[in-house]
Curated annotation (Swiss-Prot):
GO terms for biological process: isoleucine transport; L-leucine transport; valine transport. GO terms for cellular component: outer membrane-bounded periplasmic space. The keyword Transport applies. It is found in: Periplasm. It comes from the Bacteria. Residues 1-27 form the signal peptide. Belongs to the leucine-binding protein family. Keywords: Amino-acid transport, Periplasm, Signal, Transport. This is Amino acid binding protein. Binds primarily proteinogenic amino acids. It holds the Pfam family Peripla_BP_6. Gene3D superfamilies: 3.40.50.2300.
Length: 374
């Protein structure tokens, strides 16, 4: 699809709302916060918005960006690619954003980033891990997270070297993110000498996976790896347990929300579930004061909250470092300078990937909470 097609005829699909952090007269630096603010994955959108809002408030209180205030614009893509392109056009054409924090689902980030590239603005995704996000040569696309080909290695290593599994079922949701991560994990399993006993896709939005569970049972899998998001992971693990399957269930950073226990039907179903995610940013000393501020306000900064906060910090540092609110100059600055964030020091390579990835394994308890394993 040509880039021009991204910019025409689809603005009517946009679903977005504008929320400023200051008066219009002072809100000169417009930054979009794009992600699933509605729909099944809205909990991730809330994490994005909470993190970005607190960061913008703190940065504005300290003088803003080159003396100007940040104004945030909420852009809801519902993790739907067509809607993502629509809101990207809205951010560029109507809201005049010069930077974006987003999107969440890789299948949304990839097409939306073409719009941003054509418009010459900079974007940082806190959570899109598919390698193609940064493999297309876009000059202004960055991540605050790792990549699936890094995360899949960690998952595969853990399944083979720690769980000692010989029979592994690999399940995915047929989406760019979920299937890409499942394939990366499968590749690592195969590299370590373990051939999957089942490789199967499910459909996002479905809730009845009993037929799939029957296939998993027949495969004799000791571990079930699922590449996808919590709205499907929850019902899948519950139906496994209801059918008496005791195989370990492992997933990814698409389930890093307390909503996993809700979609599973209760915390008892997610006890023992494993997942890969970056090292818990709430434990990093650099972010202690910010974490305490969130908690004092009654919000637990789980998942991608601090990733979003750090993304706003990095954009502010880049514009300030460049000495102008010029996205191209900010992107070049970010590729050659480290930024101290609530998640510690971050540095990017020329593609926009972090130079250091820190994926680890977490386990869910019987209270529906996840904890980083040593």
């Amino acid at each position: 699809m040509s880039k021009k097609l991204f910019r025409k005829g689809i603005l009517a699909l946009a679903v977005s709302s504008v929320m400023g952090l200051s008066t219009h007269a002072l809100a000169d630096v417009v930054i979009g916060v794009a992600g699933p603010h509605t729909g099944a994955n809205a909990s991730f959108g809330e994490q994005y918005w909470r993190g970005a809002s607190q960061a913008a408030e703190d940065i504005n209180a300290a003088g803003g960006i080159n003396g100007e205030k940040i104004k945030l614009v909420k852009a809801d893509d519902a993790c739907e690619p067509k809607q993502a392109v629509a809101v990207a056009n809205r951010l560029v054409d109507q809201d005049k954003a010069i930077a974006v924090v987003g999107h969440f689902c890789s299948s949304s980030t990839i097409p939306a980033s073409e719009v941003y590239d054509e418009a010459g603005i900079i974007a940082i995704t806190p959570g899109s891990t598919n390698p193609q996000v940064t493999e297309r040569g876009l000059s202004g696309m960055f991540r605050m997270c790792g990549r699936d080909d890094q995360q899949g290695v960690v998952a595969g290593d853990y399944i083979v070297n720690v769980l000692k599994a010989k029979k592994v079922a690999v399940i995915h949701d047929k989406d760019t993110y979920g299937q890409g991560l499942a394939d990366a994990t499968r590749a690592q399993l195969n590299k370590l000498g373990v051939k999957e006993v089942l490789y199967e896709g499910l459909t996002r939005g479905e809730k009845d996976f009993n037929a799939l569970v029957t296939k998993i049972r027949a495969s004799g899998a000791e571990v079930v790896y699922f590449g996808g998001l919590h709205p499907e992971a929850g019902p899948l693990v519950r139906q496994m347990r209801e059918q008496g399957l005791t195989a370990r269930f492992m997933s990814d950073d698409g389930v890093v929300t307390d909503e996993l226990a809700t979609t599973a039907g209760g915390p008892q179903y997610v006890k023992g579930v494993l997942m890969t995610f970056g090292a818990d940013p709430r434990l990093i000393p650099d972010g202690k004061a910010v974490v305490e501020k969130f908690r004092a306000g009654g919000f637990e900064p789980e998942g991608y909250t601090l990733y979003s906060y750090a993304s706003i910090q990095s954009l502010a540092a880049a514009f300030n470092g460049a000495g102008a609110n010029d996205p191209a100059k900010a992107a070049e600055w970010l590729k050659s300078h480290p930024v101290q964030t609530v998640m510690g020091k971050k540095e990017w390579d020329k593609k926009g990937d972090l130079k250091v990835s820190d994926y680890v394994v977490y386990e869910w308890d019987d209270k529906g909470k996840y904890h980083q394993l040593p």
